[in-house]
């Protein structure tokens, strides 16, 4: 019986340690290669995504990945279809994020679930990136 209690306590301690220290690990940003966007362009878009995911209470961001020039160029028309009247974007950029939902008090999230969401951002003539939509693609 004592051995079973020790094993249960060790497992519980392991879970607590993972839960406490996992938030300390910074998210990875995979900028990839691009012939149309500078590293700073990709970083500023990824920063917007990171800030948004980090605002989701209890969620832990693991990675933000640039989906490449071809995907980004191909989605400019889609991004313009999301624009408010009178706005025409000249550039679009697409990322995928990987994050985990809260273990406890998950609310609308599935508890402790891994999410991979697509993010569509656009801008006009080198201006500031705007997040147009995100979620499951």
Regions found by a protein language model. Give the residues of each.
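Flexible low-complexity loop/turn motifs enriched in small/helix-breaking residues
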Residues: 4-113
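Short beta-strand edge/turn micro-motifs at domain boundaries
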Residues: 114-137
